[in-house]
A protein has these predicted regions:
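Short loop/turn and capping residues at structural boundaries
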Residues: 18, 80, 128, 165-166, ...
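A general structural-boundary detector
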Residues: 26, 75, 79, 100, ...
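Short aromatic/hydrophobic-glycine micro-motifs
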Residues: 74, 122, 160, 241-242, ...
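Short Asp/Glu-rich motifs
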Residues: 88, 174, 255
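Acidic two-metal-ion nuclease catalytic site recognized across multiple nuclease folds
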Residues: 182-334
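Conserved non-catalytic scaffold segment of RNase H-like nuclease domains
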Residues: 2-111, 271-311, 317
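Metal-dependent phosphoesterase core characteristic of DEDDh/y 3'-5' exonuclease domains
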Residues: 31-37, 41-72, 93-219, 283-287
Length: 334
């Protein structure tokens, strides 16, 4: 059965003030309200089978923001003439079909789409499968120093004729299809990593002795990984007992956390968990609404333990300095 591949591009409006909404008890910031959708259905050779294009009339950010107007060339009149957003989004998802696999240039549009579907009381569970075509492109054409990854820069680099404007949703989607025809799209889709594979690669880079990798999905609260016992409680890789995390956690990049956890049963012994075990987490929110938490434990080597002790001491110093500064400021206001 042929795949139902949908390339799509969104243009969205933003407000002059943030818009906060409640998603199953958790406050989230609205990324933007969709004002234009362009999409094409393609086969696995990127041949265009069908197209879809629509302008939408927003309900929340009704005034066209000046930067959006400059980038897209749209006017307030274009927004006012658009199809009502609920009706238009429903029509788009029906055109896509329940088995659609979405693909976009980057990973910005799916979170925006899902937020808009939710705020329009439509089913935000779709799409369940989507692809970042930049990853597939980079697999065949590794990025060189100074090379941009905007759609326009890649179209130029691939020698594709520029016969349509950019920042028009349907036009950008057709350019994306042009780029895909320059690739081995079938192979790229087949090799595309799952969320679990991506999280494992990020959390468990070589070299390292990693154990008990797990992924916990579908959480709306980012802090759940620290409060849910089944996520925060890891098992000792030697005896299977519950590990006890250190009070100090070190942040790794934008969405990773590490600590050294102790196993009461193994502490002080000569086994590989005797000096503690690193407990590591990676947080991801690919769809803009739900968090996934990846966890593993790592058997430390001597260099890793020394690095941990040094960074832990530095973190404690920073915490103490912040506390002293806050106390001094409080005294000054008294």
């Amino acid at each position: 059965m042929p795949r139902n591949l949908v390339l799509f591009d969104l243009e969205w409006n933003i407000g002059y003030k943030p818009y906060i909404f409640n998603y199953h008890g958790v406050q989230q910031t609205f990324r933007g309200e969709i004002i234009e959708i362009g999409a094409v259905k393609i086969d696995e050779d990127a041949n265009v089978l069908d197209t879809f294009s629509i302008h939408l009339r927003p309900r929340i950010f009704r005034t066209l923001q000046h930067h959006i107007a400059k980038v897209t060339g749209l006017t307030q009149a274009d927004l006012d003439r658009g199809e009502p957003i609920v009706q238009g989004l429903r029509r788009f998802m029906q055109w896509c079909g329940p088995d659609a696999e979405f693909a976009e240039w980057g990973m910005d549009d799916v979170p925006v789409l899902k937020q808009n579907l939710f705020l329009c009381n439509l089913d935000e569970s779709r799409p369940t499968q989507w692809y970042d075509l930049q990853q597939i492109f980079l697999r065949e054409h590794p990025r060189k120093e100074g090379e941009g990854m905007t759609l326009e820069s890649v179209v130029t680099r691939m020698g594709i004729p520029m016969e349509r404007p950019f920042h028009d949703a349907l036009s950008d989607t057709l350019y994306t299809a042009d780029v895909c025809r320059k690739l081995d799209l079938r192979a790229g889709l087949a090799a595309y990593p799952t969320e679990e594979e991506s999280l494992r690669a990020s959390l468990c880079p070589a070299p390292g002795d990693y154990r008990d990798f797990r992924v916990f999905r579908g959480y709306v609260e980012q802090s759940t990984w620290r409060s849910d016992p089944k996520i925060i409680t890891a098992s000792c890789p030697v005896c299977g007992g519950d590990l006890q995390p250190d009070d100090i956690w070190l942040k790794k990049g934008n969405s990773g956390w590490d600590t050294l956890s102790a196993c009461p049963a193994c502490a002080g012994t000569g086994n590989e968990a005797g000096k503690g075990v690193f407990q590591r987490y990676k947080l991801a929110r690919r769809d803009g609404l739900h968090w996934s938490f990846a966890r593993c434990v790592q058997i430390p080597d001597e260099a890793g333990l020394a690095r941990w002790e040094r960074m832990r001491a530095q973190q404690i110093e920073r915490m103490q300095a912040r506390a002293e500064k806050a106390a001094a400021e409080a005294d000054g206001k008294a």
